[in-house]
Amino acid sequence: MLNPIVRKFQYGQHIVTLETGIMARQATAAVLTSMDDTTVFVTVVGQKKLQTEQKFFPMTVNYQERTYAAGRIPGGFFRREGRPSENEILIARLIDRPIRPLFPKRFFNEVQIIATVVSLNPQVNPDIVAIIGASAALSISGMPFLGPIGAARIGYINNQYILNPNVNEIKSSSLDLIISGTEESVLMVEAEANMLTEEQIINAINYGHEQQKIVIKNIEHFAKKVKIPVWEQCLYPVNDDLEKRIIEISEQEIVKAYNIFDKVIRLDVLDKIKSKAIEIIISEYSGIDEFEITSIISNIERKIVRNRVLKNRIRIDGRNKDEIRTLDVRTGVLPRVHGSALFTRGETQSLVSVTLGTSRDAQNLDELLGDKTDNFLFHYNFPPYAVGEIGMVGSPKRREIGHGKLAKRSILAVMPKLDLFPYTIRIVSEITESNGSSSMASVCGASLALMDAGVPISNAIAGIAMGLIKEGDDFVVLTDILGDEDHLGDMDFKISGSKKGITALQMDIKVKGITNEIMKLALYQAKNARIHILNIMKKSLNVPRKDISIFAPRIHTIKINPEKIKDVIGKGGSVIRMLTEETGTTIEIEDDGTVKISAVMQEKAKCAIQRIKEITAEVEVGSVYTGKVTRIVDFGAFVSIGIGKEGLVHISQIAHKRVDKVSDHLRLHQEIFVKVLEVDRQGRLRLSIKGAK
C-alpha cells in the first residue's frame, strides 16, 4: 500500500510541494519536489557499511534533465539523453556545495544524490527546486546530516529585491543571486550582477537568507511526519593516543616548516616530516595505516596555521592580512593570437587568449528551457603541471567547468552588444601555475586579453579571492588567499568587478556564525584589493586597442532588400557558394536582409560587398550595363549583367542591319554593352545591343 506524505507551502510567488512514500522506496530517501509545474525527483542512497579502505567522504551529486519534462524528444542520432551538459554539471555543483560541509568530518560512508527533472514550467528554473529536494531527502534519510538547508534565487528589479523571479523577470534583473544556508548561517552564494555596490549585494544576501528560512521550517515539519531510519554510529574512530604521539614527534618541526615562506621548499620539508612520522609510528604501533597518520598531521598543520594568523597576524607566506601578492602583467604575449595576456599573482599564473570568430562559430545550446545561441565562450583549463603533479589530461572536469562559468559571469556585464561588435568571442585561460585563486587570475587575464584583442569592453574587470580564519568571536579576513589558506580556512569568497561595482561573486562557507560584519568587511576589503589590481593592470593596457588584430577576421555588415535574399543565395546555394569561393570570404545572411561579410583581408571583403551590391541592385529600364554572353541560340543570345541577372538579346536587337546567324556577331563569354528595354512581371530582362551603341 502506497502511503504518500505531502507538505505544501507558499514560497514567494510559487507553491512548493514535497512528497515522499510513492516512488523509489528502495532508495535510502526519495522526495518529489515541485515549484508550480517544475518538478524534480531527488533520491539519496547511502551505504551504511563503511569500507575500511575509504579514507575520504565519497559523496557524488548527479543532476539530470530529461527532455520529456519539457515535452520534447532529444536530438542526435540515438534520440536519448547522453553525457551531462555543462548546465547539468553546474547545477550539480550548486547542490553539492552547501550540502557537503554539513556532514561530520570523519563520515566516510558513500553517498549518492540524484536529482532528475521530470516536469518543467519554462518560467521556473529547476535549480532551486533541486537544492530544496536534496535538502528534504537528506533530512529524512537518517544520515548524520546537519541540515536542513534552504535555497532562494534573488533578483533586483527597479531597486526592489525579488524572491525567486521567473525566467522572464531574470532577463530584466541587474542581479541573479542564488543563496543556500541553514537557519543560522549562509553556506553558499553564487551571483552575477550588473555593477552593483557592496551594500546592495549584502542586502541581497540578507534578504535571501531570511526568505529561505521558510523552506527550512517546512522541511523540518515534513521530516517529522516521516519515519526516519536510525543509522548506527558511523564516524571513523579517533585514536587519541596516536594523536598525542604524533604531536610529540612532529609539532615543533611543523611550526619551523611554516616559517619557510617559499611554497616549494616548505612542501618539501613537510613531506620529509610526514615520512619521518610515518616511519616512527609504523615501527611503534601495529595495524595503523598511513591515512591515520597523515590525517592527524594535517590537523596539526591546520591548528598551527590558524593560530599564527589569529594570534600573530602572520600568514603562510609572511604577508599582512590585506596584502596582495606581487603582480606581473603582460599583454600581446602570443604573436599570432587575436588577443593575449599573461597575468601572474605570486605563484598563480594564467595565460589567456582571445579568439574572434563569426556567428557561425557561436555555440548552439539545446537546453531544457529552450534552444539558444551563445556568442561568448569562456574555457578554463587546469593542467596537472600547474601544481607540479602528473595527472590525466583530457576533457574538462567539473571544477574546470565551474571556474570557467564564474569567470564568464565576471566579464559578461562589460561585453559589447552583438549589434555593435558582431563577433563570436572565445576566451581560453590556461593555468600555468597555481597557488590559490586561479579563477580570479583568469578574470584579470581575460580583461587584459580582450582589450589586447580590440574588443570594446566598457570597463576593465579584476577578481580577488578572500578567506577567513575564525575561532569563536575572533576572526581575520584574508585578502588574496593561497591554496593552503583556502584549504585550512573557513571561507572561500571570490569577488570580481570594476571600479564601479561588482559583476560576480561566489562564496562557500565551512563554519557557522558568519556575521554581517564579516561579510561586509570581506566585500569592502575585496573592493580595495580590486582597485589596486585594476591600477596595476592599467599600467600595462589602459583601454581596448583601437583596431582588432591583423590576423582576425573583419566583419562588414550591409543591408539588402529581403526579397533579394534568394538572388544572393541562388538555386541550391549556388550563388553564395561561388561568391565565398571566389572572394575567400564568409557570408552570412539573416531573414531581415542583414548580410555579414567576414574576411581577414580587407580587399576580399570589399570585393564580396561589391558583388552582392551588383546582385541586389534594381535593374533600371533604359540603363546601359556591361554584360557577358552566356548562351547563344538561334533566336538571339542570353547575356548576364550580374550574378543571377540574365536577359535575352533578341536576334533583331543585335545590330542595326539584318542578322542571319547570331554566332557571326557574338561569341561565348564575350563582354558587351547592353541596354535594358524591359523587365516583365516575372523579372525577366529584354536587352538590346544596338540600343546601347
Swiss-Prot record:
Principal location listed in the UniProt entry: cytoplasm
Reactions catalysed, as given in the entry: RNA(n+1) + phosphate = RNA(n) + a ribonucleoside 5'-diphosphate
Cofactor field: Mg(2+)
Binding site for Mg(2+): D486, D492
Domain S1 motif: 622-690
Keyword Magnesium: yes
Catalytic EC class: transferase
One Pfam family in the UniProt entry: RNase_PH_C
The keyword Oxidoreductase belongs to this UniProt entry's keyword annotation: no
Enzyme nomenclature, EC number: 2.7.7.8
Subcellular localization, as worded in the UniProt entry: Cytoplasm
Cellular compartments per GO CC: cytosol
Keywords assigned by UniProt, alphabetized: Cytoplasm, Magnesium, Metal-binding, Nucleotidyltransferase, RNA-binding, Transferase
One of the GO biological process terms: mRNA catabolic process
Domain of life: Bacteria
InterPro entries: ExoRNase_PH_dom1, ExoRNase_PH_dom2, ExoRNase_PH_dom2_sf, KH_dom, KH_dom_type_1, KH_dom_type_1_sf, NA-bd_OB-fold, PNPase
Domain KH: 553-612
Function: Involved in mRNA degradation. Catalyzes the phosphorolysis of single-stranded polyribonucleotides processively in the 3'- to 5'-direction.
Record's subunit section: Component of the RNA degradosome, which is a multiprotein complex involved in RNA processing and mRNA degradation.
Protein family: Belongs to the polyribonucleotide nucleotidyltransferase family.
NCBIfam families linked to this entry: polynuc_phos, PRK11824.1
Name the record gives this protein: Polyribonucleotide nucleotidyltransferase
Species this chain originates from: Buchnera aphidicola subsp. Baizongia pistaciae (strain Bp)
Organism taxonomic ancestry: Bacteria, Pseudomonadati, Pseudomonadota, Gammaproteobacteria, Enterobacterales
Originating gene: pnp
